[in-house]
């Protein structure tokens, strides 16, 4: 199901949007020009995406002089499929998903978000055990199993002598209720998520959790252009996204989202992501 709403109405219907959505800017459709679609990875709730990306929508709408949509999907798999199908003109996606989109569908990397993303190991606040050995025979909770954070976390656990599928299994806990349930019952004594995902949780939920350790700092989100766009338009989009941090809209975006910068990115920085390509494709069902 696709839902299109104005920004003014969005906060009232965010629960509907979370099902797999498109969020539309004000009344540009009457002008007869198809909206420019920016796809944003659903690593947090639709409501948070809509709110934090409003300044970016306004910026591109002004610069492109056309309607702009901020769109997301129900989950990582759906977002990756939408990307492969070319549903968006521009995407903001996890670095590993972006690298696979580049390799398999020729999406073009334009920029990368800073700072790097901390991958963290989390437990209930009343669980004093800091050893990963407590996972043996139990489950590890993952917010987004296809994310670079999850893949890097599983790799790190392997280096600690714990193999997924042998020593423990994984369970998806994409929302506060499911995370609270699996951690609270002891089914999953530990969870892996990004610091951004942790901070996006309600204060009440965060108060029941503690960060056990930081596993790694990983590359930030990639901004990528649809390969079907003409080269000149791709270059224009790159110029616009690299100029965005210096604008008033950019400053508002960083204040809302917690990101600090959007900068140029090149092959030397992207090449190490190839180590996660096969695991990413497997996680996406490819």
Could you describe each region identified by the protein language model?
Residues 12-23:
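Bacterial N-terminal signal peptides
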Residues 30-96:
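Extracytoplasmic small-molecule ligand-binding "clamshell" domains
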Residues 34-43, 49, 115-123, 148, 152, 204-257, ...:
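Periplasmic-binding protein-like
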Residues 92-104, 159, 182-209:
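A ligand-binding cleft/hinge motif common to bilobed small-molecule-binding domains
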Residues 123-140:
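Flexible hinge/capping segments at coil-to-helix
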């Amino acid at each position: 199901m696709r839902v299109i709403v104005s920004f003014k109405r969005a906060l009232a219907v965010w629960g509907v949007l979370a099902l797999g959505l498109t969020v539309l800017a004000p009344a540009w459709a009457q002008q007869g020009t198809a909206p420019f679609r920016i796809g944003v990875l659903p690593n947090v709730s639709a409501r948070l995406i809509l709110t934090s990306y409003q300044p970016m929508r306004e910026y591109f709408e002004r610069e492109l002089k056309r309607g702009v949509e901020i769109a997301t999907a129900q989950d990582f798999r759906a977002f990756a499929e939408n990307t492969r199908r070319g549903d968006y003109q521009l995407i903001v996606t996890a670095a590993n998903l972006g690298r696979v989109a580049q390799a398999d569908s020729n999406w073009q990397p334009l920029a990368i978000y800073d700072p790097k993303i901390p991958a963290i190991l989390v437990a209930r606040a009343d669980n004093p055990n800091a050893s990963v050995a407590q996972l043996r025979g139990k489950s590890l909770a993952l917010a987004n199993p296809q994310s670079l954070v999850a893949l890097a976390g599983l790799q790190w656990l392997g280096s600690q002598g714990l193999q997924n599928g042998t020593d423990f299994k994984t369970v998806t806990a994409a929302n506060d209720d499911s995370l609270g349930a699996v951690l609270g019952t002891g089914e999953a004594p530990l969870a892996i998520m990004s610091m951004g995902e942790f901070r996006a949780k309600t204060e009440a939920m965060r108060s029941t959790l503690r960060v056990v350790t930081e596993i790694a700092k990983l590359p930030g989100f990639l901004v990528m252009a649809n390969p079907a766009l003409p080269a000149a338009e791709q270059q224009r989009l790159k110029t616009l996204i690299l100029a965005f941090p210096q604008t008033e809209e950019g400053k508002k975006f960083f204040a809302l989202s917690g990101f600090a910068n959007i900068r140029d990115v090149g092959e030397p920085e992207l090449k190490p992501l190839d180590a996660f390509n096969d695991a990413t494709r497997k996680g996406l069902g490819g």
